[in-house]
Amino acid sequence: ESIQEKNGGPKMIQVCDPPRVRPVRRFSAEEFCFLLRGEAGSLYRPRSEVLRMLTVGEVCGVCDAAGAPAGAVLLQPLNADTALAAALRAWAGWRGVEGGQFLTPPVLHQPDAAEPLLRAAFARAERLARGGRVLAVLECTAHSDALLPLYIRQGLALRALRPLNSLAPCFVLAAGCAARDPVPVWVPLQDRARLARLLASGYAALDSRQTAGQETLLAMYPA
């Protein structure tokens, strides 16, 4: 867009769009419950369990440019007395549980809030864990296919695809996973059966890429 200077010469200026989301901050329980309205994920039911999770954890959230909550994720101790924490302990065992943290699935009202939210939440979880394990849970839905590569970019590795506590199938991710083989096996994210078999045999997804046809492929390594 151009404006006219007083001397008659044109000057080009760049007009930038205002930021759509604000910096990440800690949310109150009320703000998180506001975001949960209409949320269909089984991990956030019943509401009494959500209130228990809010009591023992903290909420990392981001607002839109108008100040309304745009997205949030719960940070929970792995030793918490909640159904999801117990399900993770049953899968992972007790090693590293003391001090460990995990991220619940994000509740998003704006898709562009996901990446800054997950980046800040993962950094916060690592600080709280103080060397303990850091895990993340993502319910296996149509929306999770777009979110999974964002988790992997933050340094989390996909370690399991399984039901948790009789809930819907979930992706379970973990920090601090290293590959033992330099050559990956590329598996389409949509090939759930093959993906689950490789994960169950000890593989981990440490990278992802998209094909020209917008198909997401996961790089699976023995871990």
Question: For each of these PLM feature ranges, what is it?
Answer:
Residues 136-148, 187-190:
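Conserved beta-strand-loop-alpha-helix junction that forms the acyl-donor binding cleft
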Residues 139-140, 152-171, 204-212:
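Conserved catalytic-core motifs of GNAT/GCN5-like acyltransferases
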Residues 68-107:
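Conserved acyl-donor/pantetheine-binding loop and adjacent beta-alpha core of acyl/acetyltransferases
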Residues 50-61, 65-66, 71, 76-83, ...:
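A short helix-loop-beta-strand connector motif used in the catalytic cores of GNAT acetyltransferases and
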Residues 108-127, 153:
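Conserved acetyl-CoA-binding loop-helix of GNAT-fold acetyltransferases
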Residues 6-49, 54-64, 68-70, 182-186:
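Short amphipathic alpha-helix that is part of the acyltransferase structural core
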Residues 100, 127-142:
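Conserved GNAT acetyl-CoA-binding A-motif
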Residues 164-188, 214-223:
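C-terminal "cap" of GNAT-fold acetyltransferases
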